[in-house]
Amino acid sequence: MNYSFTEKKRIRKSFAKRENVLEVPFLLATQIDSYAKFLQLENAFDKRTDDGLQAAFNSIFPIVSHNGYARLEFVYYTLGEPLFDIPECQLRGITYAAPLRARIRLVILDKEASKPTVKEVRENEVYMGEIPLMTPSGSFVINGTERVIVSQLHRSPGVFFEHDKGKTHSSGKLLFSARIIPYRGSWLDFEFDPKDLLYFRIDRRRKMPVTILLKALGYNNEQILDIFYDKETFYLSSNGVQTDLVAGRLKGETAKVDILDKEGNVLVAKGKRITAKNIRDITNAGLTRLDVEQESLLGKALAADLIDSETGEVLASANDEITEELLAKFDINGVKEITTLYINELDQGAYISNTLRTDETAGRQAARVAIYRMMRPGEPPTEEAVEQLFNRLFFSEDSYDLSRVGRMKFNTRTYEQKLSEAQQNSWYGRLLNETFAGAADKGGYVLSVEDIVASIATLVELRNGHGEVDDIDHLGNRRVRSVGELTENQFRSGLARVERAVKERLNQAESENLMPHDLINAKPVSAAIKEFFGSSQLSQFMDQTNPLSEVTHKRRVSALGPGGLTRERAGFEVRDVHPTHYGRVCPIETPEGPNIGLINSLSVYARTNDYGFLETPYRRVIDGKVTEEIDYLSAIEEGRYVIAQANADLDSDGNLIGDLVTCREKGETIMATPDRVQYMDVATGQVVSVAASLIPFLEHDDANRALMGANMQRQAVPCLRPEKPMVGTGIERSVAVDSATAIVARRGGVVEYVDANRVVIRVHDDEATAGEVGVDIYNLVKFTRSNQSTNINQRPAVKAGDVLQRGDLVADGASTDLGELALGQNMTIAFMPWNGYNYEDSILISEKVAADDRYTSIHIEELNVVARDTKLGAEDITRDIPNLSERMQNRLDESGIVYIGAEVEAGDVLVGKVTPKGETQLTPEEKLLRAIFGEKASDVKDTSLRMPTGMSGTVIDVQVFTREGIQRDKRAQSIIDSELKRYRLDLNDQLRIFDNDAFDRIERMIVGQKANGGPMKLAKGSEITTEYLAGLPSRHDWFDIRLTDEDLAKQLELIKLSLQQKREEADELYEIKKKKLTQGDELQPGVQKMVKVFIAIKRRLQAGDKMAGRHGNKGVVSRILPVEDMPYMADGRPVDIVLNPLGVPSRMNIGQILEVHLGWAAKGIGERIDRMLKERRKAGELREFLNKLYNGSGKKEDLDSLTDEEIIELASNLRKGASFASPVFDGAKESEIREMLNLAYPSEDPEVEKLGFNDSKTQITLYDGRSGEAFDRKVTVGVMHYLKLHHLVDEKMHARSTGPYSLVTQQPLGGKAQFGGQRFGEMEVWALEAYGAAYTLQEMLTVKSDDVNGRTKMYENIVKGEHKIDAGMPESFNVLVKEIRSLGLDIDLERY
């Protein structure tokens, strides 16, 4: 087995029973691929597919003028280079975007020509605004902040059939309905009412009989009935009435008369029910007609108009009900044959026929007018307007788009469904197979008449009892709209606005000699894009607390947002877990609260297909043998197969073992024989999301707690020194690498140079492009603020001389340890009560944990100040501030900005700023004083940027931005100079490394080669030696050597050119950087200068901080106990954390207990390895012990491939504890945990005996730190990976004496942000009343709250030392009086 450079250092022992068939895919692929498809930058102009930007342009262009003589055509688009890179955009608060330019052609036709002739063509590039670019990690930088566009899970376009589940009508009758949902355009609904009449509505407007729509589509009554009904023909004669015998219609009917065969034998007696046997007898007897009673004709509907063949008189119209009068009329007129609609109560309802009777519209035009009146009430229906509206509703490509997905869904649901034999022979089968044959193939992205009729027919057939309704929560009916598609829709809507404006101007294009760029104003496009990225519900501020929260945010799918659901209307069904979520959407990870079930996370292996439906991978199974072939199946396809689970038992050849295998079929769990199985899951963790798959022993946790565990891992604050979890699941490395927090090598090579800011790698010759200088430089991110103010800091994980392969770890980031996700710390945990300090999930923690900075985290706050141009004059950033103490002034430089490295506390001035004050009338005394002392300071007021309350820290960076045309202060200039100096050094270092690398390659290439001549009189044909090269005055003289080998000479020339190019590039880059830094900054209107101060705040663990494990076991630190008081083990080691054992049973998250036991084994193994290393044992002994660890059970590791040095390095990395991986649903078994405990704590070891283990080695004797006595019972002790969450008490603690008051009520404001007071509510008042504390209550309700005069008086009394209270009238009482007066009731107050 090949281990990467980093994996060798710390191999994670996996308990997985099955080989990994499919690697975890790139976790951000959905976002990155979607946006790449939108931009199509890789494709040449003519190779671009009809997606993304290209599709948006194609859908709007060509734009034709109203008179038809001018049109604008789209040729292609290009994206320029962004002006600033990502860090610069973040610093300056601007959007990381590239300019979009479209090549547009204006074609003008000749008006005089008899046929369309092109008179003139004008073409040029038109600026279409800026398109935000995606960062390599799948986010966007909008106005300086990182944002994520969350994918949306919305209802797929197409046709859907459903019923109301009997909720509408009191009888519980099912009312069926259908809805045609386009991607863009009007919705068309069909619905049955309780009387079984069929109606339609457009865009949820007023309902109308469906026959109006059918008439509007061009059908008359007879044609409508012909489509939706089978016919019955009755033959009238003097002998009675006969009808054609259709065997299928007789079953279950009652014989109205005796049915006789030709000999007169009774086949079915009158009044008897006709059975299947009777039907066979009738068929065998060869009967073709049946006698019926004349009364049975009554109430039947005519299928067509009955016309007297002689006179041409219409005797009865289609759909007329047959009555006694009509029959008499037929008799008089000698009608011998009538055709009626075949209707029965069971499976051929009279719905359309009855609906037609309620519809009074006379024909096509009248029907269209009725629809017009419904859509545009109050507007006069002119013929042109009526036609235009009707055609635009469903048949115009401009206003209606079913989309590719919609068409596919529509066809599969209507035209391509499987019909039963009875349906094949009915009107429905004839309609689909004959009348509408081929309709599916010619269906475009607009509706056709056939589509509408087929939808109505399918709904009627449903009501007739044939077929199934759709499940709208099935993932085959919901699709994912990712970032590319969402942006395309916004771009298209912006272009549509442009189109309207352009059409107006196109008529003047020729006369005014306009060019395309004169016609197109790109403002609406950029406004639409800006609005979407800046304020759409799906454009969210990126959750950047730690790498996992970043990855999870980008993998989120939301059912909310424009075109989606709303929280209030979403019912239980939509939020619930559906069988089709399996392997596509995580059943565990979703928020608690109002969004539960509406916001989900993609499962680890899930991806979207071309149509936007989620699919998940399965291994193909053929004849009970599992193959290596992998197919991705969507929810619709999955329903057709029998699928085994990933943990099904296989033999060595991959055959399924056992008589029955647990499988899934159509969402149900079944037991199937191996030969029926068609697919098998690829991995046990396929069901869950990334966050849930990071929880070890997930299978032993209750789902509610697992949900909390998955959510709380995203809130873990990166610790100062990240520590890998001893018990993980094996997916930690994927998260760390894919989140781009840890840096991996782009190409293999040797590490040339390492410092805290940069890693330089000389690329291997075979990976470097020929003639190119192969050096990769990785600049690390240092102490950068994340969106949640946590610290992003990368640390090199390699040393000079290390040999790396592509994909090896180069640097660790926040919350990563050796390339693995490390959200918390491994803590020694004891489950026991301790003096009530772990009551209600409280956590008792050792002082040593805080002292060792195990949970210390650094938070970086950014504070801004702007100097504006005000009406009274410009604000000034200066050191000269009135009444500023010397201590504070000493921290500011001459420009008035705080020094880097200064330690600042609440209230300290960070940036001095003064604002001009309005001229006030001075008293004579003030005038005199001013005349004497020249006191001018009172003209300005101090508006400096001060450190906010409750915050203290160290200034780590200052940035100054100055508007173009305003002179920079010294500080701004020095920042620019130091930045340029650093950049120049960087470039010089790069050039030096490139040079060294190039000349090393040249030396290896030319030493030993023959030369035709060269510097220092090199003779022709002489061999080039190292000494000769060293003797040349400069290495650049090597290029003057003339080699005999022409290929080598060419390579030498290429390297020379490459170096020259690098030098020119470096100079060019320096000039660009200089220009960027020295040009003025783009600031908001009226802002002259802006200063940003970055402050690093160190937060130690303290009482009140929230902590949690990975199993939803959360709590608040109640006390930090001195280490000497903590419970300790027999060997004197104290535990780190004491948890309440009662927090486990009722919560049913037993995973934490198993984690603690396995963690305890990991720690014990680490201690044994540590002892062996201290005793300087031989590498062979270490190898033997590690073999027991890695190759006892579970997945086997190839330790023989490691050298002795690598074994020793591996062992030294395991000193603090072994690393275990217990994958979800395939984790360590109890026996394996026991095996590891026995390996860690062998019974023969005297040290182990001293600890006082129980038989299973899961509990030990602990001693009370205060008394030294042993606790009565043995205690479960072990190691758990414990996290500190982002709910820090430092950020919540707040106190106020006086502060701002509300304007109306004059009560103190609420909340820390407003520096508000504590709410003293109704229940608190009751408490004081209960105690009879009248005076306390009085001051609470008056002077401490809203008695304005009283609180001023109170202040005076305290200053004077008079401790008495003068309570007056609360202002809120005056508010109440005013409110009552506003109701027209006057209240007068009387004094007593």
From Swiss-Prot:
Signal peptide: none annotated. Keywords: DNA-directed RNA polymerase, Nucleotidyltransferase, Transcription, Transferase. It comes from the Bacteria. It comes from Neisseria gonorrhoeae (strain NCCP11945). This is DNA-directed RNA polymerase subunit beta. GO terms for biological process: DNA-templated transcription. Belongs to the RNA polymerase beta chain family. SUPFAM superfamilies: beta and beta-prime subunits of DNA dependent RNA-polymerase. DNA-dependent RNA polymerase catalyzes the transcription of DNA into RNA using the four ribonucleoside triphosphates as substrates. GO terms for cellular component: DNA-directed RNA polymerase complex. The RNAP catalytic core consists of 2 alpha, 1 beta, 1 beta' and 1 omega subunit. When a sigma factor is associated with the core the holoenzyme is formed, which can initiate transcription. InterPro entries: DNA-dir_RNA_pol_bsu_ext_1_sf (IPR042107), DNA-dir_RNA_pol_bsu_external_1 (IPR019462), DNA-dir_RNA_pol_su2 (IPR015712), DNA-dir_RNAP_su2_dom (IPR007120), DNA-dir_RNAP_su2_hyb_sf (IPR037033), RNA_pol_bsu_bac (IPR010243), RNA_pol_bsu_CS (IPR007121), RNA_pol_bsu_protrusion (IPR007644). It catalyses: RNA(n) + a ribonucleoside 5'-triphosphate = RNA(n+1) + diphosphate.
